[in-house]
Swiss-Prot record:
Catalyzes the attachment of alanine to tRNA(Ala) in a two-step reaction: alanine is first activated by ATP to form Ala-AMP and then transferred to the acceptor end of tRNA(Ala). Also edits incorrectly charged Ser-tRNA(Ala) and Gly-tRNA(Ala) via its editing domain. It comes from Hydrogenovibrio crunogenus (strain DSM 25203 / XCL-2) (Thiomicrospira crunogena). Its cofactor is Zn(2+). SUPFAM superfamilies: Class II aaRS and biotin synthetases (SSF55681), Putative anticodon-binding domain of alanyl-tRNA synthetase (AlaRS) (SSF101353), ThrRS/AlaRS common domain (SSF55186), Translation proteins (SSF50447). Binds 1 zinc ion per subunit. It comes from the Bacteria. The gene is alaS. This is Alanine--tRNA ligase. It is an enzyme of class 6 (ligase). Its EC number is 6.1.1.7. Residues 828-847 are annotated as: Disordered. NCBIfam families: alaS. Consists of three domains; the N-terminal catalytic domain, the editing domain and the C-terminal C-Ala domain. The editing domain removes incorrectly charged amino acids, while the C-Ala domain, along with tRNA(Ala), serves as a bridge to cooperatively bring together the editing and aminoacylation centers thus stimulating deacylation of misacylated tRNAs. It is found in: Cytoplasm.
Length: 864
């Protein structure tokens, strides 16, 4: 039974039992920014199990793509050394949300395995939690499982919990017995870690709610969460003891064998490569790109581990990305998103492979030298850190090599080196830092800026030079804290508001507003009179600047959505800056964006602006926001209540910034630049509204000037330029022909200037007006004509000297063109080289050329 047939059989079986088939969620969990990767089928149903989300069905089934690499669940170091560890696997699951419970879950599992798949009952072993008498009775008394193939286990293996508190409950696991010829004992026995009994299905019964004191309270509606590894089940059904021998892996292993030249399909490095292409490809599909932090670094580690295993097999050229088409053939039907993103996956992996290839060989030499000089069995932390810092070797890659040599790595020493580097970085970043905007204040400010541009407020505190004062007078710079404010404080990439605090003839100009804890710091200067603590003032923001910031912030959301639409869902925000004058957006992408793509992105943003969709801003609890589809950034800390900014069907994000009410208020949107700022990170800068109109006016003015210079009308500029380009190419062609004729005639004249030196015809001369191509053509003619010959020809263009040297092949044993041209080039401030019969060089001192050419005869005399 193929893996594809198993997927279908599983889903079909549970759909017949009233379950709704739910497509796999991404390997990047959209509902849990604290979780590195989706590592189980239940992750996409987490809110449903917690009662924070309701679905239109109470029974679900899925085939979930999962990753276990990095974080709590990390199988990376075992991949390639065991039969069943993978960084990527597929989990078959069926779920009950307060519907059926233990009896039905056990019946479904047993029926599917023994009847649908036809597995012999005597090959299956059952475990239950030692205190779960209910599950025990169902298995032994109702299902008729033999007590000889049944065991009770402790909480370590058979009690599941979502965390220290919350839903939890006992598990029942189903194992497959691979036979007495395989080492290992049954679950619960001293030798249970062998390969004879392999867990294939885990049935989790969410039965209790664990409180902080450890008390277990029965849930009013218990649920079921089950998970079965497709790869393990396929190994059973295909009569294999090693997952890498199933159909899903064999096609990839064979392709890796073809690319590396390794013929042994059981080679552990081939298996590592086959496993790693699966996890790497699906990470890119779901928006992860190689980087030096978070998920991106996990991806980088896995890619580089795969490349190192290819290098171990003798493959020094890039190869890893070439496995993607084979993977698509195997898994594209089950995961259409893989087909859609194939080109992006190939490009991202190829770029990372090319980047690492530049340092891999040198890094391996350093490591080999260190290993050769080891007096013990531990690679030092300093060596591991040097490989990491200089050559891009993740620690686990170095540990992988060490493991193959029965060595280990001083990980504690490596961490000491890392911490020392972090300390240096902190010191550098804090150098000269000022804390002038840090004040001793623990109160709070009520923000009313979403609704109001101005409001009366009371001055709660004033700080001058970080010292709390009762009063500030004209000319003094100060920080003012109010009890409430319409001023937006700098956060989320949006700059703080500017404006004024006034009362009668007293005025304080606010240059910026920042947040410290729950307090808003109004930073500025007293411009008239004085201000005092307890004084009631009118706080008024610069409305024009605020509206411009709102336009740019809303445009940033539309830009983010447009980038994901045009470039792919791997695009994720890496940073942003929203000012009244412009916006800047940093995002993950693996290559420069083409002019055509930039135009498409700009048009898509403007299209959504012109739709004039209402911008809905709503506060809701975090789980409701996630359920609505709002994007949550990995690593961001969100409170229980978040603000959701919804722009029609095009964009929905969590955001605390200020925005327009309708997208049409943004006005025109223009991209002004696109650039790369780091590996895998691009930056777009853009303007909106009046600033965008200004760029259009400037371009229009420039076009008018160009048209005037070309003596044509605006509509004809493009065709006129094309005409001029064509004419220029024709003129260049004619010039080249004339230069060739001139050089040829000069060459004919030069033939009479040949001097014979030790039987060799020597010629060294300058050709006026010649380029390098003309020098070569002339050289070829003269070399054939003057056989045996040693010739140097030169040309001068400004302060640059071009040199070519040619030597007849019959004399290259003694007279070599590369050495000859280098002899001349060194005298004119340059260098060069090439083949024994043909070489080229350059120089930057034309004043020495005549003398250098004169030295050729003497040089030939010494070698010929």
């Amino acid at each position: 039974m193929t893996s594809a047939e198993l997927r279908k059989a599983f889903l079909d079986f549970f759909v017949k039992q009233g379950h709704t088939a739910v497509h796999s969620s991404p390997v990047v969990p959209g509902n849990d920014p604290t979780l590195l990767f989706t590592n189980a089928g239940m992750v996409q149903f987490k809110e449903t199990f917690l009662g924070q989300e309701t679905r239109e069905y109470k029974r679900a089934t899925s085939v979930q793509r999962c990753i276990r690499a990095g974080g709590k669940h990390n199988d990376l170091e075992n991949v390639g050394y065991t039969a069943r560890h993978h960084t990527f696997f597929e989990m078959l699951g069926n779920f009950s949300f307060g519907d059926y419970f233990k009896r039905e879950a056990i019946q479904y599992a047993w029926t599917f395995l023994t009847e649908e798949l036809g597995l012999p009952e005597e090959k299956l072993w059952i475990t239950v939690f030692e205190e779960d008498r209910e599950a025990e009775d169902i298995w032994l008394k109702e299902m008729g499982v033999s007590a000889e193939r049944f065991s009770r286990c402790g909480a370590k293996d058979n009690f599941w919990s979502m965390g220290d508190t919350g839903p939890c409950g006992p598990c029942s696991e189903i194992f497959y017995d691979h036979g007495a010829d395989v080492a290992g004992g049954p679950p619960g026995s001293p030798d249970e870690d062998g390969d004879r009994y392999i867990e294939i299905w885990n049935l989790v019964f969410m039965q209790f709610d664990r409180s902080e004191d450890g008390t277990l309270t029965p849930l009013p509606k218990p649920s079921v969460d089950t998970g079965m590894g497709l790869e393990r089940l396929a190994a059973v059904m295909q009569n294999q003891h090693n997952n890498y021998d199933i159909d899903l892996f064999q096609a990839i292993v064979k392709k890796a064998s073809e690319l590396t030249g390794e013929k042994d399909l059981a080679n552990s490095s081939l298996r590592v490569i086959a496993d790693h292409i699966r996890s790497c490809a699906f990470m890119v599909v779901d928006g992860v790109l190689p980087s030096n932090e978070g998920r991106g670094y996990v991806l980088r580690r896995i890619i580089r581990r795969a490349i190192r295993h290819g290098y171990k097999l003798g493959q020094t050229d890039i190869f890893f990305y070439q496995l993607v088409p084979t993977l698509v053939e195997q898994m594209g039907e089950a995961y259409p998103e893989l087909v859609k993103e194939q080109a992006n996956v190939e490009r991202a992996l190829k770029l990372e492979e090319e980047r690492f290839a530049e340092t891999l060989e040198n890094g391996m030499k350093i490591l080999e030298e260190d290993i050769a000089q080891l007096s013990g069995s531990v690679i030092s932390g300093s060596t591991a850190f040097k490989l990491y810092d200089t050559y891009g070797f993740p620690l686990d890659l170095t540990a992988d090599v060490a493991r193959e040599r029965n060595l280990s790595v001083d990980e504690a020493g490596f961490e000491q080196e890392m911490e020392a580097q972090r300390a240096r970085a902190r010191s550098a970043s804090n150098f000269g830092a000022q804390s002038k905007n840090k004040v001793d204040y623990t109160g709070s400010t009520h923000f009313i800026g979403y609704e109001q541009d101005e409001a009366e407020a009371e001055i709660a505190a004033i700080f001058v030079d970080n010292v709390s004062v009762e009063k500030a007078s004209e000319g003094q710079e100060a920080i003012v804290i109010l009890n409430q404010t319409p001023f937006y404080a700098e956060s989320g990439g949006q700059v703080g508001d500017q404006g004024s605090l006034t009362e009668g003839m007293n005025s304080f100009h606010v240059d910026n507003c920042q947040k410290q804890g729950a307090a808003f710091l109004h930073i500025g200067k007293v411009t008239a009179g004085s201000i005092s603590v307890g004084q009631t003032i009118l706080a008024h923001i610069d409305v024009k600047a605020r509206r411009a910031s709102e336009r740019n912030h809303s445009a940033t959301h539309l830009l983010h959505a447009a980038l994901r639409t045009v470039l792919g869902t791997h695009v994720g925000q890496k940073g942003s800056l929203v000012q009244p004058e412009r916006l800047r957006f940093d995002f993950s992408h693996f290559e420069p964006i083409s002019a055509e793509q930039l135009l498409e992105i700009e048009q898509l943003v403007n299209h959504n602006i012109m739709l004039n969709a209402q911008v809905m801003m709503e506060e809701m609890d975090i789980e409701a926001a996630k359920a609505k589809g709002a994007m949550a950034l990995f690593g961001e800390k969100y409170g229980d209540v978040v603000r959701v900014v919804d722009m029609g069907d095009f964009s929905i994000e969590l955001c605390g910034g200020t925005h327009v009410n309708w997208t049409g208020e943004i006005g025109p949107f223009r991209i002004t630049s696109e650039s790369g700022i780091a590996s895998g990170v691009r930056r777009i800068e853009a303007v909106t509204g009046e600033a965008a109109w200004q760029t259009i006016y400037d371009m229009e003015k420039s076009l008018l000037n160009i048209a005037a210079n070309l003596k044509t009308d605006k509509p004809q500029v493009e065709s006129k330029v094309a005409q001029l380009v064509t004419e220029q190419k024709e003129l260049e062609k004619q010039l080249k022909q004339l230069q060739s004729k001139l050089a040829s005639s000069q060459g004919d004249d030069l033939a009479s200037s040949v001097t014979e030196v030790n039987g060799v015809n020597v010629l060294a001369a300058e050709l006026e007006g010649a380029d390098v191509n003309t020098l070569r053509e002339t050289l070829d003619k003269l070399r054939d004509k003057l056989e045996p010959a040693a010739i140097v020809l030169a040309a001068v263009d400004g302060d640059k000297v071009s040199l070519v040297a040619g030597v007849s092949k019959s004399i290259t044993g003694n007279v070599k063109a590369g050495e000859l041209v280098n002899h001349v080039a060194q005298q004119v401030g340059g260098k060069g080289g090439g083949r024994p019969d043909m070489a080229q060089a350059g120089g930057k001192d034309p004043s020495k050329l005549k003398e250098a050419l004169a030295s050729v005869k003497e040089w030939v005399a010494t070698v010929a």
